Design a protein with these regions (language model features):
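Acidic, metal/ion-coordinating pockets
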Residues: 21-361
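Bacterial Sec-dependent N-terminal signal peptides
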Residues: 1-23
């Protein structure tokens, strides 16, 4: 979480001074999957004594990995529509979730997904307002078309490497886009135009975060593969997928210098049936030599949502699978790591289909 500058086409927000770029500039990016907000997660975050919500503990064990990256991004798959707070099927989470996500080390969020319109116009607008108030950069949804034109794509300068970030969803569960707002949907013509607009801003790399695919299917669909091929041909360098809520394979095309991640799974949710109870974070290493295009390398880290019962409440902790396997989480070690072990076994089977994206060591 060492983001230096966030820039949009007509707006620049300086976060920290840029370091001088050396002959070989190395930048690390981290992408995480779906941040969900089911009823039991809301209940777990509630403090009966203070009558407030706090999600900080949920992220405490994964925070060191997120903070270590120069830039970290996740899919924010809830609305912040205000009370009454509720989970599936139409999510509205407490603002405290966004506070904890920022505290964990995430530098930006994508907001265009099938739950974007769950809270109607209030949900779309208030989510953006809360993220803005917390100074969390975001993209994919907008207050209006003027804001879309001004702020899309999101341009991020990370230690001298400039990224253009795009975000689209396949749909919004048949809910209409609230009047006046903009929710980016997967449309080939619009995407091609947006990529062309991104190129005019001269980024080092273009990132497309795609909410696509078939839920709970560990194999990419034909439409995912076709869209990925189109994105690559149009010049997108990093394709990061979400929506299936399970892992799907990843690949680095070393010849084309492009990364394709079909689905990262559930970063945090209350979906407890395998293989929805875990995910992966993909770590991307960018090496830029002078004016050359950055070289892309990647690996992945498996994560699991630990769900212990404490008193009459279920708690949620995102943990790195490797930390549990190596005995590094003794304060929360459990007799119930069997489900984690099964998730890890199944996840590694899916990841065995990766190309040039190994498990992090």
């Amino acid at each position: 979480m060492n983001l230096k500058t966030i820039i949009v086409p007509l707006l620049a927000i300086a976060v920290q001074p840029l370091k001088a770029q050396t002959a070989d500039s190395v930048v690390t990016l981290l992408f995480a999957g779906d941040i969900m907000g089911h009823d039991s997660q809301i209940a777990a975050a509630y403090n009966d004594s203070t009558k407030t919500y706090d999600y900080t503990d949920c992220f405490r064990y994964i925070k060191p990995y997120v903070e270590k990256a120069d830039f970290a991004l996740a899919n924010f798959e809830v609305t912040l529509a205000g009370p009454p707070f509720k989970g599936y099927p139409q999510f509205s989470s407490p603002d405290a979730l966004a506070v904890a996500v920022k505290d964990c080390g995430f530098d930006a969020l994508v907001t265009s997904n099938n739950h974007t319109c769950d809270g109607g116009r209030k949900g779309v607008v208030r989510t953006l307002d809360v993220l803005d108030s917390l100074q969390i950069p975001h993209t994919g949804t907008f207050h209006d078309s003027a804001e879309f034109r001004q702020k899309y794509p999101l341009i991020v300068d990370v230690k001298g490497i400039k990224l253009a970030i795009l975000n689209y969803t396949y749909g919004t569960n048949e809910l209409p886009t609230p009047k006046g707002t903009v929710v980016n949907r997967i449309d080939k013509h619009n995407i091609i135009n947006d990529i062309a607009a991104a190129k005019r801003l001269n980024p080092d790399l273009i990132v497309a975060c795609m909410h696509w695919g078939i839920e709970y299917d560990t194999v990419p669909s034909r439409s995912q593969m076709q869209m990925a091929e189109m994105l690559k041909k149009q010049g997108v360098d990093l394709i990061i997928g979400s929506h299936p809520h399970v892992l799907q394979p990843m690949e680095v095309d070393t010849a084309a210098n492009q990364l394709l991640v079909y689905s990262l799974g559930n970063f945090v949710s209350a979906q407890r049936t395998a293989p929805r109870d875990g995910a992966a974070m993909v770590n991307v290493r960018l090496t830029k030599h002078c004016s050359q295009k950055p070289k892309i390398e990647a690996d992945y880290l498996l994560t699991y949502v630990h769900y212990p019962k404490v008193g009459d409440k279920r708690l949620f902790y995102i943990v790195a699978v490797a930390d549990v396997e190596n005995g590094l989480l003794k304060p929360i070690q459990s007799d119930n790591w069997g489900r984690l072990s099964q998730f890890a076994k199944d996840a590694r089977e899916v990841m065995s289909r990766n190309t040039n994206v190994p498990e992090a060591k």
